Amino acid sequence: YLQNLFDKIYISDIVERNKILHEKSVLDELLNIISSSIGSLTNPSNIAKTFHSVRQIDIDSATVARYLDFFIDSFMISKAERYDVKGRKYIGSPLKYYFSDVGLRNARLNFRQQEENHIMENIIYNELIVRGFSVDVGVVYSREQNSSGNYSKVAREIDFVAVKGGRKVYIQSAFALPDEEKAAQEMKPFALTGDSFPKVIIRKDIRKRWYDDRGVLNMGLIDFLLDENSI
C-alpha cells in the first residue's frame, strides 16, 4: 500500500505538476538515495557525485537541488540546516533530510536498511516539528589534540537545536549509551555550547527520565513521544 502511495500519489503528482515526465527515473533514483541517507549530512553536490559513481547517471547539482525542492514542496521530506551555536549563524551545506512519514521511507526501500538509530532520529525530528518547534542541526567547535600532538579545530554536532518562541532546547538522539565513553561522546557537544539552555538526551535504552550530574535530562524515547510536554 505504501509503495503504491508513493508511485500513484507523490511521484505522479510531482511529475505532472512540474512537467518532468522524461525525468521520472531520475526522481526515483534520487528518492532512493535520500531514503538511504536520512539523518546523514549531505548536499546536492554530493548526491550528484553519487549519481555518477554509483548509478552511472550524469546530473548537475542544480538539478538535484531543484528536484529536492519538489520533494520538500510535496511535504514528502524536510530539511534541517546546520547552525553555528556560538557564532549564531547558519553554516549552509551540508545539511540533513528527514522523511515526513518514516513508514513511506521504509516502504521505498522495501523495508531494508532498518537502521534503528537513524529511524529514531527521524521520528524525534518529526515529533518536534509537530509540537511547533523549528529544528536545526547544531554545530559547536573546540580545539582538540590529535594523536600527533597537534591541535586543530574540531566540529561537534548536536542532533537538534529546537526553538519555539523564546525557548531553546539542545537535544541528542542516542539509541543506547552502553558505556561511559559513548555517553561522554554524546554529552561533549552540550558542554561546548557555553550557555544554560536545557539539554536533553533522548534514549531508546531507558524508560524513566532522570538528570545526570551535568544537569542533562536523560529521557526514554517512549516517554518523550507520549508526553507532549516532556521538553
Predicted regions and their residues:
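Conserved helicase/translocase motor-coupling segment
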Residues: Y1-D73, K79
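A cross-kingdom feature that marks ATP-driven nucleic-acid transaction machinery
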Residues: T63-I231
